[in-house]
Amino acid sequence: MASECGDTAHVSEAPGRLTIVGLGGSLRAASHSRAALEVALAGAEEAGAETRLLDLRELALPMFDPEHESPAGAAAELVETCYAADGMLWSSPLYQGTVSGAFKNSLDWLHILGSREPPYLHDRS
């Protein structure tokens, strides 16, 4: 199944193999949205992709502060892993009709990718 938070390397073991990163946006221990994401990642793996799960409960991201855009620790892991992915699967519970605060915070951290070339998650599926 998908590897979890840890190493940020993108290079696939097999040339031509896609790397799919799943971003799980629930802080709940028994998360239904994370369970659905794990099923989707398993399907991607069965189709030949290398997969990685970024579980926001385990990642424990600090709040994004736009005045301090140099990520370290968990934030750097999130940013580098997402940028290196060939494709992403996102899953979040809905609270008050929108994504969880933890999920939104993770997307805020990806703002840092705007200064890269190509910017953000451009050309990712």
Where are the regions a protein language model picked out?
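Basic/polar N-terminal segments that are highly enriched at the extreme N-terminus
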Residues: M1-R17
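Helix-loop-strand module that forms the ligand-binding subsite of alpha/beta enzymes
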Residues: S3, P71-S125
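Short secondary-structure boundary/capping segments
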Residues: S12, G43, L53, V79-E80, ...
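N-terminal beta1-alpha1 ligand-phosphate binding loop
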Residues: S12-A49
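Short, glycine/charged-enriched secondary-structure capping and boundary segments
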Residues: A35-E38, P66-E69, F103-L107
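Short beta-strand segments at enzyme active-site cores
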Residues: R52-D55, W90-S92
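N-terminal beta-loop-helix "entrance" segment that forms/cooperates
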Residues: L53-G73
